[in-house]
């Protein structure tokens, strides 16, 4: 059972993360400063440092929360249900998270610590997706499952990136093609 102090600390961390998300969306990770985050959170910089040792610690917590949310969103769903439609229509679970992950990827090209955080988060997401798919498709080998996860990750992440540009092909034409790809990936071997 958590104490009132722990609850207050968690609430304060949530407020800081919310403020940081707004700052990072507006200015990018690289340009957003701790003073901007403090101002947005209506705290002093010193108060922020009580909860997070530096900006990278805030980024790390943000990545952890986004990945936790994505893993939770994966539960109780099969890969083939809804995914062709989501890909074809470029639907997303959380547009803000997608934009922040794109921003984090850009920051990772400049900051080895952020690159390491993203690598660890991706490994966690990949392992969880493999375990989730293995439950749905126990007839597939572990190697094939890993290939399926990699291919679906490329399709999902590519769709997230491509959401920034207009569709060149109607979604109605793309959806059955995505369905065929997924059917082929998860067919009995």
Segments and roles (model prediction):
Residues 41-52:
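Short hydrophobic/aromatic patch on the recognition helix
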Residues 59-66:
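Alpha-helical DNA-contacting segments of helix-turn-helix folds
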Residues 1-27, 34-40, 57:
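Basic, helix-initiating cap at the start of DNA-binding domains
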């Amino acid at each position: 059972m958590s104490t009132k102090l722990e609850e207050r600390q968690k609430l304060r961390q949530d407020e800081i993360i919310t403020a940081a998300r707004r700052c990072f969306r507006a200015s990018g990770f690289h340009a957003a400063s701790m003073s901007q985050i403090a101002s947005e959170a209506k705290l002093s910089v010193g108060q922020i440092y009580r909860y997070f040792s530096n900006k990278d610690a805030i980024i790390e917590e943000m990545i952890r929360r986004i990945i936790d949310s994505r893993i939770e969103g994966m539960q109780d769903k099969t890969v083939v249900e809804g995914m062709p439609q989501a890909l074809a229509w470029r639907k997303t679970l959380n547009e803000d998270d997608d934009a922040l992950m794109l921003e984090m990827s850009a920051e990772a090209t400049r900051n080895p610590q952020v690159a390491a955080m993203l690598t660890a988060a991706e490994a966690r997401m990949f392992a969880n997706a493999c375990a989730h798919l293995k439950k749905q498709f126990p007839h597939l080998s572990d190697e094939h499952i890993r290939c399926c996860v990699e291919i679906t990750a490329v399709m999902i992440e590519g769709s997230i990136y491509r959401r920034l540009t207009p569709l060149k092909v109607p979604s109605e034409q793309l959806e059955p093609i995505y369905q065929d790809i997924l059917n082929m990936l998860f067919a009995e071997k």
